[in-house]
């Protein structure tokens, strides 16, 4: 990650409206990962990431920031919900599985990078295998391949193959099929299941079987097989573990749902237990994964929650101390809704325009129409539950319902969505609080 904080914020601005404080915090945290890697080894080990706690109501962009960050970081990234985990000893997923899943993601990422690096060699080998099926080499009576003059023919076929002229032709090929072992275990023991599966699959040799498929599909399968032959599994494991330890990012959503609310007890015991189990992972510990031991000392943790019932101070004091950077995301205004409808690269209005274009219907959203949509969504949020920008999806679906249903019969038409159109479609529902609650 060599992008500067300003570049990261600019990239996030293309998809997320407002919330500049949160964008700055994640941009600085991401850049600090790169800065740390430029330091000498002894100093590098002393610098730990400054974990972030994002606080804000639902639908204001917390999860979207995480989603976009994952694409920008090009590093092992996992998003989990705190409510999915239980204290050790209870039935359910343990928090250690977060790091195991992150290691799996890292392995996949490193393998993809290795495949890309060897793509040219793998491409040539895959093409050779296809050409061997199309133009089987001549053999003598002892089974030895004879050198014949078909080199020029192979070149002609290779050119056709690369140009896609043979894509639809069917051939029969041998593909390796790993042995799949299904193991049934009780709930909460998924980690043991995956380890046993890896053990048994490693003991069973891969078999090959013949399959008929189109050349374009066969080329993809063979490309994967040939690329797998060119990578060193042990080297991949080392790189994957290093990527997790030095660049891994964990986003924990709904952290407020595992707070102990007030003086209540009972069901909250397990919630507090999840917080206690999170402590060593965030502070720095070693987790055993199927790829090897992973140290969590330098993994960046970003936690988020609405904190509408609980408060950040309801988290365990030790956990609060491990989340030193606090960022508050603001509730969205009507003006924010207007910007969300038009400014992002894949704005909602653009999505609907392009979808209807496939049916030959031209949709035009006027400025006063967009203002009315934003106002309607904002009013429904005020009257009922405030679900932030997600309300725009429900309002737009309601607005576009008739056009979406009839689009196939209205090819060639132009539909202008202005203030009057929006009022006619939504006013009854927006004004009636009971209808708003159930429909929008």
Swiss-Prot record:
Its main location: cytoplasm. It is found in: Cytoplasm. GO terms for cellular component: HslUV protease complex. ATP binds at residues 17, 59-64, 253, 318, 390. One of its GO terms (biological process) is proteolysis involved in protein catabolic process. One of its GO terms (molecular function) is proteasome-activating activity. CDD domains: RecA-like_HslU. A double ring-shaped homohexamer of HslV is capped on each side by a ring-shaped HslU homohexamer. The assembly of the HslU/HslV complex is dependent on binding of ATP. This is ATP-dependent protease ATPase subunit HslU. It comes from Mannheimia succiniciproducens (strain KCTC 0769BP / MBEL55E). The gene is hslU.
């Amino acid at each position: 990650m060599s992008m500067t904080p300003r570049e990261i914020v600019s990239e996030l601005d293309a998809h997320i409206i407002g919330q500049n404080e949160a964008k700055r915090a994640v941009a600085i945290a991401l850049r600090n990962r790169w800065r740390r890697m430029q330091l000498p080894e002894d100093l590098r080990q002393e610098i730990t990431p400054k974990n972030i706690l994002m606080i804000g109501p639902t639908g204001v962009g917390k999860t979207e920031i995480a989603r976009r960050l994952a694409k920008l970081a090009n590093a092992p990234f996992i998003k989990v919900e705190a409510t999915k985990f239980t204290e050790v000893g209870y039935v359910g997923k343990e928090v250690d599985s977060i790091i195991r899943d992150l290691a799996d993601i890292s392995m996949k990422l490193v393998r993809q990078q290795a495949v890309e690096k060897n793509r040219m060699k793998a491409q040539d080998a895959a093409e050779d295998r296809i050409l061997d099926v199309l133009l089987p080499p001549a053999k003598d009576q002892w089974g030895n391949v004879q050198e014949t003059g078909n080199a020029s023919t192979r070149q002609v076929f290779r050119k056709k193959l690369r140009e896609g002229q043979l894509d639809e032709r069917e051939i029969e090929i041998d593909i390796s099929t790993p042995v799949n072992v299904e193991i049934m275990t009780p709930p909460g023991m998924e980690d043991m299941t995956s380890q046993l599966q890896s053990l048994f699959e490693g003991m069973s040799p891969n078999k090959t079987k013949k399959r008929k498929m189109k050349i374009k599909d066969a080329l993809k399968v063979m490309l994967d097989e040939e690329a797998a032959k060119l990578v060193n599994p042990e080297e991949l494991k080392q790189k994957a573990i290093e990527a997790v330890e030095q660049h891994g990012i964990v986003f924990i959503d709904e952290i407020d749902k595992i707070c102990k609310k007030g003086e209540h007890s009972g069901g909250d015991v397990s919630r507090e237990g999840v917080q206690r189990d999170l402590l060593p992972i965030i502070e720095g510990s070693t987790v055993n994964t199927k790829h090897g031991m992973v140290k969590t000392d330098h993994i960046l943790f970003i936690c988020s929650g609405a904190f509408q019932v609980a408060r950040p101070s309801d988290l365990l004091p030790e956990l609060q101390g491990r989340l030193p950077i606090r960022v508050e995301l603001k509730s969205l205004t009507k003006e924010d809704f207007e910007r969300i409808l038009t400014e992002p690269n894949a704005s909602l209005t653009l999505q609907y325009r392009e979808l209807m274009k496939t049916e030959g219907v031209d949709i035009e959203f006027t400025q006063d129409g967009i203002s009315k949509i934003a106002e309607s969504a904002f009013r429904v949020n005020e009257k009922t539950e405030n679900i932030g920008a997600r309300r725009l999806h429900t309002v737009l679906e309601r607005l576009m319902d008739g056009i979406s249903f009839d689009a196939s019969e209205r090819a060639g038409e132009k539909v202008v969505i202005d203030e009057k159109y929006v009022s006619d479609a939504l006013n009854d529902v927006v004004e009636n609080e009971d209808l708003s609650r159930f429909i929008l």
